[in-house]
């Protein structure tokens, strides 16, 4: 840096310091002089303070209203995207000591077979799984024999058809996914084997979905080929209402209302998704009983056996 530039920087710095000192002295002198408008200033300050308080109150109210509107908008958009939150129904098999209603499972299988099986598959369920749960072995064999299964190859290397057996899975309604989408306007009917586990709040969701069809509210337009259902994400579903009063004639004579059919088919689907539930609960109680006995035995030995050994003192008597 040149000498002239250093000198200019020094003068600039000195000038700034001088202006700062002069300004501070002037402010101190002004503060000592009495003002002619003190009363007016005091009144204006009070008015400004009241106005600022009112402004802050209005700002707080506006922020609260804006927050409520934002929350309502977010809740509405979330409801439209994910569907309504399903109510909780008192399913009889959800208790700790409860088991499945096997009569309801049998009726639910009847509803699935006559209403749902034309579009939805249950690829993980075999006919033998129904034995002892909803049907006897003879009834299940007769039911399986009603279907035809493509098997093979035979000794000549050709495929053949045969009557169904207990080891066969439930038949598929469509040959492949493309055929299923073509038959349902582009929508793919999901497999129902694990549907109550694959959906959030599964049992309640399936029941609410099956029984909540209604006309769309004012201002909501549904594309042709879709149906309004508030519990389905987006509110528009390709599946029409399938459960109508009297759609199925139960073998035990119970009236087949919409709610009854929905309850029964959900019981059947819950069993299909978790057939080991009853065995798991029973095994849990067995383990609790065994571990309780082990805990009591450990407490006994800890209190009456080990405490004696733990508190024992050994005295070493050294004989000279």
UniProtKB/Swiss-Prot annotation:
Residues 78-280 are mitochondrial intermembrane. Keywords: Electron transport, Heme, Iron, Membrane, Metal-binding, Mitochondrion, Mitochondrion inner membrane, Respiratory chain, Transit peptide, Translocase, Transmembrane, Transmembrane helix, Transport. Binds 1 heme c group covalently per subunit. The chain crosses the membrane at residues 281-301. It is an enzyme of class 7 (translocase). Its EC number is 7.1.1.8. One of its GO terms (molecular function) is heme binding. InterPro entries: Cyt_c-like_dom, Cyt_c-like_dom_sf, Cyt_c1, Cyt_c1_TM_anchor_C. Heme c binds at residues 116, 119-120, 239. SUPFAM superfamilies: Cytochrome c, Cytochrome c1 subunit of cytochrome bc1 complex (Ubiquinol-cytochrome c reductase), transmembrane anchor. Residues 302-320 are mitochondrial matrix. It catalyses: a quinol + 2 Fe(III)-[cytochrome c](out) = a quinone + 2 Fe(II)-[cytochrome c](out) + 2 H(+)(out). The keyword Acetylation does not apply. Its main location: mitochondrion. Its cofactor is heme c. Component of the ubiquinol-cytochrome c oxidoreductase (cytochrome b-c1 complex, complex III, CIII), a multisubunit enzyme composed of 3 respiratory subunits cytochrome b, cytochrome c1 and Rieske protein, 2 core protein subunits, and additional low-molecular weight protein subunits. The complex exists as an obligatory dimer and forms supercomplexes (SCs) in the inner mitochondrial membrane with cytochrome c oxidase (complex IV, CIV). This is Cytochrome c1-1, heme protein, mitochondrial. The gene is CYCL.
């Amino acid at each position: 840096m040149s000498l002239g530039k250093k000198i200019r920087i020094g003068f600039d710095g000195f000038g700034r310091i001088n202006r700062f000192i002069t300004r501070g002295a002037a402010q101190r002198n002004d503060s000592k002089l009495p003002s002619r408008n003190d009363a007016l200033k005091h009144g204006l300050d009070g008015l400004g303070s009241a106005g600022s308080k009112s402004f802050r109150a209005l700002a707080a109210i506006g922020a609260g209203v804006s927050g409520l509107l934002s929350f309502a908008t977010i809740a509405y958009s979330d409801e439209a995207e994910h569907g309504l939150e399903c109510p909780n129904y008192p399913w009889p098999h959800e208790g700790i000591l409860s088991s499945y209603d096997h009569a309801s499972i049998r009726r639910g299988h009847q509803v699935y077979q006559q209403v749902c099986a034309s579009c939805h598959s249950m690829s993980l369920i075999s006919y033998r799984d129904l034995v002892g749960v909803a049907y006897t072995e003879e009834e299940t064999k007769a039911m399986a024999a009603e279907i035809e299964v493509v098997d093979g190859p035979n000794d000549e290397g050709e495929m053949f058809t045969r009557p169904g057996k207990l080891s066969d899975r439930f038949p598929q309604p469509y040959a492949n996914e493309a055929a299923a989408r073509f038959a349902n306007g582009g929508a793919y009917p999901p497999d129902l084997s694990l549907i109550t586990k694959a959906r959030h709040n599964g049992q309640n969701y399936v029941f609410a979905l099956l029984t909540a069809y209604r006309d769309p509210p004012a201002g909501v337009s549904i594309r042709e080929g879709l149906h309004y259902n508030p519990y389905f994400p987006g509110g528009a579903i390709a599946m029409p209402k399938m459960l109508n009063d009297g759609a199925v004639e139960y073998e035990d004579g119970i009236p087949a209302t919409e709610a009854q059919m929905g309850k029964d088919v959900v019981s059947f689907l819950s069993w299909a998704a978790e057939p080991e539930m009853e065995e798991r609960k029973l095994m849990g109680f067995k383990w609790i009983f065994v571990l309780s006995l082990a805990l009591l035995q450990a407490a006994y030995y800890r209190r009456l056996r080990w405490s004696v050994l733990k508190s024992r003192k050994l005295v070493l008597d050294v004989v000279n």
